[in-house]
Amino acid sequence: MNTPHQIQYEAFAAARGLYDERHAKLYAEFAEDLIADGSFSIVYEGVAHACYTPLTIDKALHLKCFVLAPLAVLPEFQRKGYATRLMEEAEKQLDADVIFVMGEPFHYGNRYNTPHKVLPPVKTQAPLECWFARELSPGALDGIGESTSSVTGPYAAPLMWGHPSEQV
């Protein structure tokens, strides 16, 4: 059985493009830090891993929210639906109202497409068009309007909210 560290490291080490071995090490260690801090961690069929960290919407303290990151699938299993099935299973287990993710539109735009005005919990140069939400409780974000949000623990580090080119 692959560990979260192994899955994160191998996936990002093989990703190329924006990522290199330094990112692989950073994200694998980040996942370990999140797990040690109590974030929800899920390994799906030994080939995919993700962490979900509690997030507070400052104008909606009653909502149970999480932010997803990091998510990785071993290279030989990518583009075969493992990430989607992992997210579906995590959503069942978390019983959340809303899940947020900061990421590329081509990865997350279809699944995380709930309109919202919740700001990321950490100041980032990333465009707000890359800050996605998925309501799991229909209407959970209705009437919230613009709001700040917050996280604690390892994901509160500004480095992890930066563009990959800024992280290493």
Ranges and model annotations:
Residues 52-53, 86, 90, 114-118:
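Short acidic (Asp/Glu) patches
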Residues 8, 12-43, 49-56:
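Active-site rim helix/loop that mediates acceptor-substrate recognition in acyltransferases
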Residues 99-128:
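Conserved active-site alpha-helix within GNAT-family acetyltransferase domains
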Residues 123-167:
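C-terminal "cap" of GNAT-fold acetyltransferases
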